[in-house]
A protein has these predicted regions:
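Helix-coil boundary/capping segments in enzymes
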Residues: 1-310
Length: 310
């Protein structure tokens, strides 16, 4: 069915390969079994979780046609895994290596009732830019259908200096997000495609802290790029920053109505007690409720105000 997708299965270890490239990291067993997730959610007092796929499995390296078929395959199984579970909701995936096919599949997913999709920062797997003109059809549909687009960094951003000290996760993810989203800010995507809602994990990487510098770049190069300050106001962020002061800074820059509880479950670098950092920030009861679920309930069109997170 998928001639350019390889599966390595040894014991309880699964790895994927695409288009003759190297194998992915091992698939975390907790991504395949929802029972530990359900137990963890109950322990943490989480009512509803928004689930995207695993970026390593998205297959952006495949040809457009095979990539479309692979994305449909992933979506079918993700939707099936969350069907009948009121506390799990799915974000789909699209073949970002081709803007027209990504747009077509996004239309299908929205017709099926999904709130939106999770996409990677590099539309060709280990390279590419989200502001590439060939992706305009995807962004146009995202805006027209008022889709949620969760932008997640890829594994590594091509800098070999990150190969030591486990810095691919600690540093590289944030750099990848910052670079990718800075490009669509400068490209004016939030003005051109105002109907979509973009969500960033890990507190947006370095983006909130570099916003002043990004804006100053426009000041010294007038009339060349869109002002990032304008687009930034339309972005949502999660709370996976691990530090109460960092969270308070994020809220000050983005607004409390743009911040939602996140976890990065089940990955080791995720925040497995996600409410702790929010409570430690000393926010008002109203703001805490917004972060714990009210904002997510509105954004993802959940029936009740509840605790939603990724």
């Amino acid at each position: 069915m998928f001639p350019n997708v390889d599966l390595m299965h040894e014991g309880d270890t699964y790895k994927l390969g695409f288009a003759g490239g190297g194998l992915t990291r091992p698939l975390n067993p907790k991504l395949r079994n929802s029972e530990p997730r359900q137990i963890w959610m109950q322990e943490q007092g989480i009512d509803v979780q928004i689930n995207g796929g695993w970026l390593d499995s998205f297959g952006y390296e495949l040809s457009p046609d095979e990539g479309l078929a692979w994305s449909r395959f992933l979506n079918e199984h993700l939707i099936a895994a969350t069907k009948g579970k009121d506390n799990l909701r799915a974000l789909g995936t699209v073949p970002l290596q081709n803007g027209e096919k990504a747009a077509r599949l996004l239309e299908e997913l929205m017709d099926e009732g999904l709130a939106g999709v999770m996409i990677g920062t590099q539309p060709n797997g280990n390279h590419g830019n989200l502001d590439a003109p060939e992706l305009d059809p995807f962004w146009a549909v995202a805006s027209d259908r008022k889709a949620v687009v969760f932008i997640h960094p890829m594994y590594g951003c091509g800098d070999i200096r990150l190969n030591d000290y486990d810095m691919i996760n600690a540093v590289g993810r944030g750099l990848d997000t910052t670079t990718a989203v800075a490009r669509i800010l400068y490209a004016g995507h939030f003005t051109r495609y105002p109907g979509m809602s973009v969500v960033l994990p890990h507190g947006g990487g370095a983006l909130p802290w570099m916003l002043g510098r990004l804006h100053h770049n426009v000041v010294i190069h007038p009339d060349q790029y869109a002002d990032p300050l304008e687009g930034f106001s339309h972005i949502y962020f999660d709370t996976v920053v691990f530090d109460p002061d960092a969270l308070k800074f994020l809220i000050a820059k983005a607004g409390v109505d743009k911040v939602m509880l996140g976890s990065d479950y089940p990955f080791p670098i995720g925040d497995h007690t996600p409410k702790v950092v929010v409570k430690a920030a000393g926010l008002s009861e109203i703001d805490t409720k917004a972060i714990f679920g009210e904002t997510a309930a509105k954004l993802f069109k959940l029936e009740d105000s509840c605790v939603g997170q990724h």
